[in-house]
Amino acid sequence: MFPKTVKVGAHKYKVIYPYYFIEDNELMGSSYQFDGTLKIAKLSFDGTERAKDLIKETFLHELIHATCDIYERIEISRSDDNETIVKRLSTGWFQVLKDNDLLLDKKHEMPKSVKIGGFKWKIQYPYVFRDLTSSAMQVDYHHLTIRIGCAIETGLQASNSFTKHCLINAILKCICDSLDISKIGDDNRILSSLSEGFCQVFMDNKIQKIIRG
C-alpha cells in the first residue's frame, strides 16, 4: 500500500506499515525526524482492521507532520496547535488528492478544474500575467477561479516545477481559508514555504497515486 521510504526535503523517512503501537493502542500513527520513521497502524484500538481510506489519511497526516518539521519547524511543528493544524491539513489534502487528478506527473499540464471541499474551482492555465515576478498565481474567490501564470508579455516561459508549485500554493491557500487555518493562510511566507514542501513531497513520492490507488 505504501512505499518503503519517502523523501521529505533532503531527509529520507522509512515507512513502517503495519505498525502495532503496543505502548498506546489508541495511537494510529507517528512521525519522528530523529530516527527518520513514519509508523502507520493497520488495526484500530479494538483490534479490528481500519478502513483503507482511514489508513491512507493517517499516512498523509504523518507525512504532513514530517513536511512541517522540515519546511516550517518553528511556526508550525513547535506551535501549541500543531496537531489541530496538521489534522485540518491532512483532511483537506486527502479530499483534494482523492477527488482530483492534479496532473503532477505531466509536464506543463494542469487540470481544468479542481474540487476543494464542496466547491469546484476553475483553473485558468496558461494565463499571461504582466509580470510573473509580482503575480504568478491568483486565487479569485468571487468567481471560484485559480489563475496560474505560464509566461510574461516579453515571452519568458515559466518552468514546469514553478507552475506546479503555483498550483499547490493556490490549493493550499483555499484549504486553509475553508478550514480556518489562518496561521498558514494569512502568512504568505509560511504559505509559500509549506506549499514548496508539499509540492516536493507529493511529486517526488507520487503521493496522489498512493491516495487514489
Report the location of each language-model feature.
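Extended, structured, electrostatic nucleic-acid-contact surfaces
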Residues: 161
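Metalloprotease/metallohydrolase-associated module, dominated by Zn2+-dependent proteases
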Residues: 1-53, 70-158, 178-213
